[in-house]
Structures are given as structure tokens and as C-alpha cells.
Regions:
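Membrane-helix cytosolic exit motif
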Residues: 252, 256, 264-265
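Alpha-helical protein-protein interaction elements
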Residues: 8-10, 41, 67, 244
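Short, Lys/Arg-enriched, disordered terminal segments
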Residues: 3, 282-283
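Aromatic-residue hotspot detector
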Residues: 16, 171, 251-252
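Conserved beta-strand/loop scaffold segments within soluble protein domains that form the structured core
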Residues: 26-231, 235-238, 259, 265-282
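Short cationic/low-complexity microdomains
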Residues: 19-21, 181-182, 247-248
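Long, low-complexity, mixed-charge
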Residues: 1-36
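Extended amphipathic alpha-helical segments enriched in small hydrophobics
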Residues: 229-254
Length: 283
């Protein structure tokens, strides 16, 4: 998969150029590191890693999951909201291997993130859950891809997001069934809550199939705060921002529940709460 000259990621099957979603550019002033972080799980091994990006810059991670191994990765991006960040995670999963990934993209003025998982072996599995949050005039650019090459592979991609203020967000989610991936199944679902009429949302769900004997499903749910729902919540004693916070927290809960480090999970929850209560909704 070739990326554009000014970027580092591209959707597997480019669409109309005028949509502006084919390529994912690196934020201005950032370059990818020459040596990525290497993570691996040997045959029969079960390992868990946490990767955090808290300063402006770029992080690249390469993951190798051997036959019959399991690797779980939690990736947290809490970069200060006045600087940019970019990340790339690529994982290869062997026969009977399992890769679980939980991603939180909550910081940065401009964030660009690629996740590419290749289920190379038969019976390989990928379970991906992602969360993004944008407010003010921030830009979020995400490209998540699961390639299913082996037979009887299983892919699950679940993404939850919330947009406030004048935030601009592009999310590309792809399930790519390669020829020979007979008996494979895949599910992709993105749910985004839009809390401002000025937020700009682009969702690009793709399901590509070069194999007939597969079962794939993808969906996007875009929710806006309607007057009736807001009236109901406020009639129960909540002000507008507290009502919005309740809805967003309910959406994010399944993703945050996967973070086993209680201290880290609490930190992220508190961080999102401060942003929700202090951010701009309809200005």
C-alpha cells in the first residue's frame, strides 16, 4: 500500500479524490521515526503492552504475533492540545494467533493515526476497539485496516467517538478479505456522537472482498443531540453539559473498560470529563 508523498497512509482502494479521504498526511513539522518500537509474542505466549504518547511527536510500533500466541496492546495518545501527534501501528498475526488492541486518541491539535493488522495465518483473530475525542478546532485523521489473508480468520473493529466545537474528523475503517481467506468473518462498526452543529464528520467504512466464501458486516451510526433527548435529561436535573457528558461516557464505556490499569483508566476518564465540561459545544 503506497502512501502519498506528503503522508504515510492510504486507504486500500482509493475513492474520488475530491472527497479528500484517500491519503492520511503527517501533521506539518512531524516525520516518522527511522526505528520503530518492536513488540512480539512467541508461540504459546500471552503478553500485554501499554504504549503512551504524551508529547508532541511521532510513534511507530511494529507487532509480531507468532502462531498460537496472544498479544494485547493498549495505545494511549494524550498529547497537549496545542501541538500535533502522529502514530503508526502495524501488526502481523500468525496461525491461531490473537491480537487485541485498544486505542485512545484524545489529545493533540492535529492527530494522524494508522492501524494496520494483517491476519496472515489461518484462524488468526483481531479484536480492535478505538476511541477518539475532538473539540474546538482540532483535526482528527484516522485510518484503521484489517487485512484477512488466512482461512477462517476473525476480525472485529469497534470505534466510538465524540465531536464538539469546530472539530474536523476523518475516520477510514477497512475490512479487506484477500483471495484465499475462505470461511473468514469480519465486523466493523463506528458510532460517533456529534455535539455541535459546526463539527465536521467524515466516516468512510470500506469492506473489500476478493473471496466469495466470507461473511463481513460494516456500519456507521452518527448521532446528534436532539431537542427531545436533551429536554428529557435536563428535566431530570442535569444541565446541558452534564447531559452531554452522560451520553458520551455511555458511548466510551465499552472501550475504557478494556484498559486493565485502573490508574490509567481513571486518568483518561478524568481527562475526558474535564474536556467535555470545559469544551465548546455549539459556538
Amino acid at each position: 500500500m503506497m502512501a502519498a508523498a506528503n503522508g504515510f497512509s492510504r486507504i486500500p482502494m482509493p475513492t474520488w479524490r475530491w472527497l479528500g479521504v484517500n491519503d492520511l498526511p503527517v501533521p506539518e513539522g512531524l516525520t516518522l521515526p527511522s526505528v520503530p518500537i518492536q513488540l512480539s509474542a512467541a508461540t504459546g505466549e500471552r503478553v500485554h503492552h501499554v504504549a503512551e504518547l504524551r508529547d508532541s511527536g511521532v510513534q511507530e510500533i511494529e507487532v509480531t504475533v507468532a502462531d498460537g500466541a496472544e498479544l494485547s496492546l493498549t495505545y494511549i495518545q494524550l498529547v497537549p492540545t496545542d501541538v500535533s501527534a502522529a502514530s503508526r501501528i502495524r501488526a502481523a498475526v500468525g496461525k491461531g494467533g490473537r491480537f487485541s488492541c485498544t486505542l485512545v486518541e484524545a489529545g493533540a491539535q492535529h492527530t494522524a493515526s494508522e492501524l494496520q493488522v494483517t491476519l496472515a495465518g489461518d484462524d488468526a483473530c483481531a479484536d480492535v476497539w478505538g476511541l477518539y475525542f475532538g473539540d474546538d478546532a482540532r483535526k482528527i485523521d484516522l485510518n484503521y485496516i484489517i487485512r484477512q489473508e488466512g482461512q477462517h480468520t476473525d476480525a472485529n473493529m469497534q470505534v466510538r467517538g465524540a465531536l464538539l466545537g469546530h472539530c474536523v474528523k476523518n475516520f477510514r475503517g477497512t475490512l479487506d478479505f484477500i483471495q484465499g481467506a475462505r470461511g473468514s468473518v469480519g465486523k466493523e462498526d463506528e458510532e460517533v456522537v456529534i455535539l455541535s452543529p459546526h463539527a465536521h464528520n467524515r466516516s468512510v467504512p470500506l469492506m473489500l472482498s476478493h473471496e466469495g466464501d466470507v461473511d463481513g458486516h460494516h456500519a456507521v451510526s452518527i448521532g446528534r443531540m436532539d431537542a427531545d433527548k436533551m429536554f428529557y435529561l435536563m428535566s431530570r436535573g442535569l444541565d446541558e453539559r452534564a447531559a452531554q457528558q452522560l451520553i458520551v461516557e455511555a458511548s466510551f464505556a465499552p472501550v475504557l473498560a478494556r484498559i486493565t490499569d485502573e490508574t490509567l483508566r481513571t486518568e483518561i476518564g478524568d481527562y475526558l470529563e474535564r474536556r467535555l465540561l470545559g469544551g465548546t459545544q455549539g459556538e
